[in-house]
């Protein structure tokens, strides 16, 4: 039995039409719990979950003026650049991948990569650096291409005309002659750079949505991303039930999606900081001074070939994200409490199938446990509907 999909958000409409996730819609103009057929009353609770909206990546909240807080970090130390070039290129016996370098700035790392034999596409968002970057590629037979583009603004969700440095990944990859390969194929290319200093979490969310939906850069295959990330966000990303205070939704999403490896650690002080006015010689803002005491971690994120299964697909991943957000929204609650709000299926039976007790807490569930939980619900045949949500709460 299939549900009507009128009024569903686009991603959920696709899920319903594809059969990946069956919903019982609860709302003022839809069936309520009391209208459900008796065979579907499987452990229902009195409350229904809010379907969490997709994050808006266009307008990040600001606590102060943009000019006073925005800054970028660049590799300007020659020795560090040579070290990173060796890390990115890997073993000499392997043919080098095409490298997409994000915001290379003054091009110290770019030059080291070229000297090591790499083929580089420099995606630079600041026009000031472009002439110098282009000069590095002279007499190199096309080993360097420089494009005015901000990697973190690829495929903006705002709609309308895309203006540089934002860009369409389809147009970018077509211009570079890069074709899509199957998900099970080898890594087609590498992306290297640094997450935005004031937008690491936001960038991780955008990439997560792109990866699980196989859109943007991930439409072309299992793109390897190598990024420097701040110490605090790194600790959260790698947290597990052993670190419950740091363990959160992105921990689960990324640990399931990718093999994550630390390639290098470097103090903040090893990088030069630039603002819109140029190099920042004497940072005085307390927030920045605190960051300078931390380390930056260079992490490698390679998407897993076995991420997608019959029951977790690019068509229903958004339901999985909703399950995680719902659970970590009340992280101290038991899993069974959340299940009673998320699905009309028998919550006790589901927990029994995945080998968990009724008193299992959210923060005690490992990433693979959440995936197993989701897939168990998806493949269940006990009820006509798999998931519950209240469409009247959707956009609140």
Swiss-Prot record:
One of its GO terms (biological process) is transcription initiation at mitochondrial promoter. It catalyses: adenosine in rRNA + S-adenosyl-L-methionine = N(6)-methyladenosine in rRNA + S-adenosyl-L-homocysteine + H(+). GO terms for cellular component: mitochondrial matrix; mitochondrial nucleoid; mitochondrion. It is an enzyme of class 2 (transferase). GO terms for molecular function: mitochondrial transcription factor activity; RNA binding; rRNA (adenine-N6,N6-)-dimethyltransferase activity; rRNA (adenine-N6-)-methyltransferase activity. InterPro entries: KsgA/Erm (IPR001737), rRNA_Ade_methylase_Trfase_N (IPR020598), SAM-dependent_MTases_sf (IPR029063). Residues 330-331 are annotated as: DNA-binding. Disulfide bonds: none annotated. The keyword Transport does not apply. S-adenosyl-L-methionine binds at residues 75, 124, 150. It is found in: Mitochondrion. Coiled coil: none annotated. Residues 1-19 form a transit peptide. Residues 44-64 are annotated as: Disordered. Pfam families: RrnaAD. Induction: By the nuclear respiratory factors NRF1 and NRF2/GABPB2 and PGC-1 coactivators. It comes from the Eukaryota. Its main location: mitochondrion. Ubiquitously expressed. S-adenosyl-L-methionine-dependent rRNA methyltransferase which may methylate two specific adjacent adenosines in the loop of a conserved hairpin near the 3'-end of 12S mitochondrial rRNA. Component of the mitochondrial transcription initiation complex, composed at least of TFB2M, TFAM and POLRMT that is required for basal transcription of mitochondrial DNA. In this complex, TFAM recruits POLRMT to a specific promoter whereas TFB2M induces structural changes in POLRMT to enable promoter opening and trapping of the DNA non-template strand. Homodimer. Component of the mitochondrial transcription initiation complex, composed at least of TFB2M, TFAM and POLRMT. In this complex TFAM recruits POLRMT to the promoter whereas TFB2M induces structural changes in POLRMT to enable promoter opening and trapping of the DNA non-template strand. Interacts with mitochondrial RNA polymerase POLRMT. Interacts with TFAM. Belongs to the class I-like SAM-binding methyltransferase superfamily. rRNA adenine N(6)-methyltransferase family. KsgA subfamily. This is Dimethyladenosine transferase 2, mitochondrial. It comes from Homo sapiens (Human). The gene is TFB2M.
